[in-house]
Amino acid sequence: MRVFTTGQLLGTVVAVQANFYKVQLDQDVREPGSRGAGEEVHLDSPLPLYPLSLLLCTRRTRLKKIGQQVMVGDRVVVEEPDWAGGRGAIAEVLSRQTQLDRPPIANADQILLVFAVADPPLEPYQLSRFLVKAETTGLDVVLCLNKSDLVSPEIQQQISDRLLAWGYQPLFISVEKQINIDQIAKYLSNKITVVAGPSGVGKSSLINALIPDINLRVGEVSGKLARGRHTTRHVELFELPNGGLLADTPGFNQPDVDCSPEELVHYFPEARERLAVASCRFNDCLHRDEPDCAVRGDWERYEHYLEFLADAIARQTQLYQQADPESTLKLKTKGKGQSQYEPKLESKKYRRTSRRTQVQGLQDLYQEEE
């Protein structure tokens, strides 16, 4: 058990603003016994006026020198709190249990993936891409389908059966009708949860329902594209009434699946089930047209797997080309976002001679004739 010295506090970074860090202190440091002498207390306050629940902190120079970054979600030790000014200094970053790069969050426990069953309609390919991206994080995935009041119970059952075959048990909710919001709250209790999903599905509205006093900006769905406008600009943790922290992330439509081709198959629960009872003939099988493959078959998302695999192979090839300057191929970008590999010309062989070099050559020739 860690022992903290006098003047040290433990907390969680809930927001990063330039070189400042908003730290939410643990509950036990806000007890009446931890107040300094002479500090006034209002009896009708739910918590003592001092110490504060949040401190705006800087990072110690020592941490900067050793390159220790501070992320949202980090558990940190705060020294020398200035209760009057609401300031402090981060002296230490405790070891991280998990770490996400995009969005940059530490110590997250699970991902709450929010989609809508209507307005915008549920797109299987887009949902599959988000699910694979969520699986790559190694966190637990909770699938939540909003706007369930817009479809019939029969349609809900069809969607549920389909997603069960994918390996996921969806939870149908409606923020507008307050359907199953309490069930979502149970999943989030005492955990750090990352909320993800495309724009326009009701993520911000759901967070507003879970934390009524947060008042996140809510974007309407664009009529032209049937997609929501981006309403979340940065990553921040918000405290839930029943314990736990919620991280809202910037909305985006198609996340990158940035895993290796060999790893991809393990991010499909259906494929994992097949590999649990059988093995492929080849250890490096990519489950396309190899003989005696245990994964290839008639499961619904197999076509999604092949498309994501092609993307992963193309990405890996591009990384290899960028890392090898002596490569004989180069990636050339075409119009409309398309790209292709072309033979690389020999360096300097086809370069036009500069005018300066031509003049110098003429001067040398003139001097030789003299």
Curated annotation (Swiss-Prot):
GTP binds at residues 146-149, 197-205. Its EC number is 3.6.1.-. Residues 328-370 are annotated as: Disordered. Its main location: cytoplasm. This is Small ribosomal subunit biogenesis GTPase RsgA. Gene3D superfamilies: Nucleic acid-binding proteins, P-loop containing nucleotide triphosphate hydrolases, Probable gtpase engc, domain 3. Its cofactor is Zn(2+). Pfam families: RsgA_GTPase (PF03193). GO terms for biological process: ribosomal small subunit biogenesis. One of its GO terms (cellular component) is cytoplasm. Binds 1 zinc ion per subunit. It is found in: Cytoplasm. GO terms for molecular function: GTP binding; GTPase activity; metal ion binding; rRNA binding. It comes from the Bacteria. Zn(2+) binds at residues 280, 285, 287, 293. Monomer. Associates with 30S ribosomal subunit, binds 16S rRNA. NCBIfam families: PRK12289.1, ribosome small subunit-dependent GTPase A. Belongs to the TRAFAC class YlqF/YawG GTPase family. RsgA subfamily. The keyword rRNA-binding applies. InterPro entries: G_CP_dom, NA-bd_OB-fold, P-loop_NTPase, Ribosome_biogen_GTPase_RsgA, RsgA_GTPase_dom. It is an enzyme of class 3 (hydrolase). The keyword Protein biosynthesis does not apply.
